[in-house]
Amino acid sequence: MVHKVSQREFSRCYKRNCDCICRKPKQRRNVYLNYSLELLITIFKEVIPNLPMDKKIAFVKDYGAYLKVEKGLITCKIKNQVKWSIAPTELHSIVVLTNSSISSEVVKVANEYGIEIVFFNKHEPYAKLIPAKYAGSFKVWLKQLTAWKRRKVEFAKAFIYGKVHNQWVTLRYYERKYGYNLTSQELDRLAREITFVNTAEEVMQKEAEAAKVYWRGVKSLLPKSLGFKGRMKRVSDNLDPFNRALNIGYGMLRKVVWGAVISVGLNPYIGFLHKFRSGRISLVFDLMEEFRSPFVDRKLIGLARESADKVTDLKTVYSLFSDVKEDEIYTQARRLVNAILNDEEYRPYLAK
């Protein structure tokens, strides 16, 4: 069988030794019913600690399973029968527990989206695929580590200033064009206040304050039929269409930002804003912050206001982000590496 599970499902099964939803026949396909406790513990140590709340793991357990890419989705087939298909933006890892085949296209897509592929032999992981294009120079990495020690707050402030400023620009656009009162001036005030804080904790606090104002404003712009109550990152069956579309958009944005970070020689795991954690591409998440609102949110808001039904159509959502402005993202990555190498001020991307 091939199982797709979230971190919450795994934790629930693991802690109770599968004495939970595993007992319900209708849900057995989604849990680790036949996995030994020893194997579960190994998987937990190897993969689960790095699993973001909005990602899933695909387990390949059936002998002879074949993974390929069809219509942009990672698809599992057994004897030419489709067992499941999943968007790469939803995946954190693919764990292969038995003899199976994986096409080179799956490996390519996994590389582009930062999906780990882990191979197990019995109860032991014996291989993990990492991107071949990962090629940062030693000089850049040393400077990046030095900047991480000495300029962490400076860079964190720049990333979040850019994020909040661009959120303000998005809400201000709708206020000016359609006469909404979205209290965008609060975001402008918070963005300016960020430049005066002195600690990373204060930066995160201002970001959280801005998020409340921003998503409240976004909610006012969306059709009520979408059921959007606020930003939710966790992947679940009950996720509203707009949040689901946001996750897809951010996943595709992450792919481009990751490529940009690697192309300029930076280490994607050494970030300034997001805390370091094994396997976490902290710098990619840092740089993404500036682009979330102008490159993802604004497009989806426009799509939802045009037709709420289009937000529920995955094909439409994917096509919406097929033309991400890669040039601007790569330019910003070069600006970041120059600021690190030359001890210059980093200027975030500011939408107009």
Curated annotation (Swiss-Prot):
Q: What is its EC number?
A: 3.1.-.-
**UniProt GO MF annotations:** DNA binding; endonuclease activity; metal ion binding
The chain's disulfide connectivity reads none
**Which metal ions or organic cofactors does this protein require, according to UniProt?**
Mg(2+); Mn(2+)
Entry function: CRISPR (clustered regularly interspaced short palindromic repeat), is an adaptive immune system that provides protection against mobile genetic elements (viruses, transposable elements and conjugative plasmids). CRISPR clusters contain spacers, sequences complementary to antecedent mobile elements, and target invading nucleic acids. CRISPR clusters are transcribed and processed into CRISPR RNA (crRNA). Acts as a dsDNA endonuclease. Involved in the integration of spacer DNA into the CRISPR cassette.
Q: How does it assemble?
A: Homodimer, forms a heterotetramer with a Cas2 homodimer.
Q: Which NCBIfam families match?
A: cas1
> What is this protein called in UniProt?
CRISPR-associated endonuclease Cas1 1
Native source organism of the sequence: Saccharolobus solfataricus (strain ATCC 35092 / DSM 1617 / JCM 11322 / P2)
